[in-house]
């Protein structure tokens, strides 16, 4: 699943957060309510691929070593800045993206 397509939907729908967790479905927080984006359950591979799309080499290494990394990223295609948190929860990798 392409994380940048989901981020585009996040921007279009004016969502504050995107939740992307292995073993779950992608979700958005819109006006304080968490709503599903899709019905397909994400795999560990989906989350790791998204990590590689969002994080630079050093950030990916920090995640591999500490199982947690936080950073901000500016994506010109959206003309937006996002705060990204990649972590493990109950041994499943997860990503939370905040539209700032």
Task: Show where each model-derived region lies.
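N-terminal "pre-motor" subdomain/linker immediately upstream of P-loop NTPase catalytic cores
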Residues: 1-100
């Amino acid at each position: 699943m392409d994380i940048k397509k989901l981020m585009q939907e996040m921007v279009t729908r004016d969502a504050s957060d995107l939740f992307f967790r292995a073993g779950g479905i992608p979700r958005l927080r819109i006006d304080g309510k968490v709503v599903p984006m899709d019905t397909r359950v994400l795999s560990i591979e989906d989350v790791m691929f998204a990590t590689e799309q969002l994080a630079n080499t050093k950030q990916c290494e920090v995640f591999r070593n500490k199982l947690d990394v936080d950073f901000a990223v500016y994506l010109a295609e959206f003309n937006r800045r996002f705060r990204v948190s990649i972590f493990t929860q109950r041994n499943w990798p997860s990503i939370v993206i905040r539209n700032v």
